[in-house]
């Protein structure tokens, strides 16, 4: 249980497909705890193992009242044709934001800490965060999907209006 240092945005691990978890053991539990500690330290909404330099297909999403969503080897099984464009950012790319179009609804298969398959359906912001994390696990940063990267003035205007 340690706050880990984030890797720099140019680190090669952020641009490669991450290895699936194959062993559900104490090391995985420690990784999940490290991710949780780092997530809260960074005041982030989500974090993936490659963002702390770990080549394992694991991510966490803070769903606020519902708690933390653990994603282990997540795979999108289906997604809606209906999409929504919204602003995204990443703790890997501080102060950079872009508009990204993503499906409004998704169904994902993942695994729990014991290796049991779990299927979940997510909507709106949670679906967006899951897709963003799965992109991280596939070596895709949100800037590759963004149809518009905001300049400093646009970012200030956006956050002033929230």
Swiss-Prot record:
GO terms for biological process: co-translational protein modification; translation. This is Peptide deformylase-like. Gene3D superfamilies: Peptide deformylase. NCBIfam families: PRK14595.1. InterPro entries: Peptide_deformylase (IPR023635), Peptide_deformylase_sf (IPR036821). One of its GO terms (molecular function) is peptide deformylase activity. Belongs to the polypeptide deformylase family.
């Amino acid at each position: 249980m340690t706050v880990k240092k984030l890797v720099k945005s140019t680190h090669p691990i952020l641009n490669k497909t991450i290895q699936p978890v194959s062993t559900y053991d104490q090391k995985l539990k420690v990784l999940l705890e490290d991710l949780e500690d780092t997530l809260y330290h960074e005041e982030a909404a989500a974090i993936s193992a490659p963002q702390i330099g770990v080549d394992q297909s694991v991510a966490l999403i803070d769903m606020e009242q519902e708690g933390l969503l653990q994603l282990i080897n997540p795979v999108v099984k289906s997604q809606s044709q209906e999409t929504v464009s919204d602003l995204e950012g990443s703790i890997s790319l501080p102060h950079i934001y872009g508009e990204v179009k993503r499906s409004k609804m998704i169904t994902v298969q993942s695994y729990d800490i014991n290796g049991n398959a779990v299927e979940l359906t997510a909507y709106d912001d949670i679906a967006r965060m899951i897709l963003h994390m799965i992109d991280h696990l596939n070596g895709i940063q949100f800037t590759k999907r963004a149809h518009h990267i905001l300049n400093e003035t646009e970012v200030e205007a956006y956050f002033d209006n929230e």
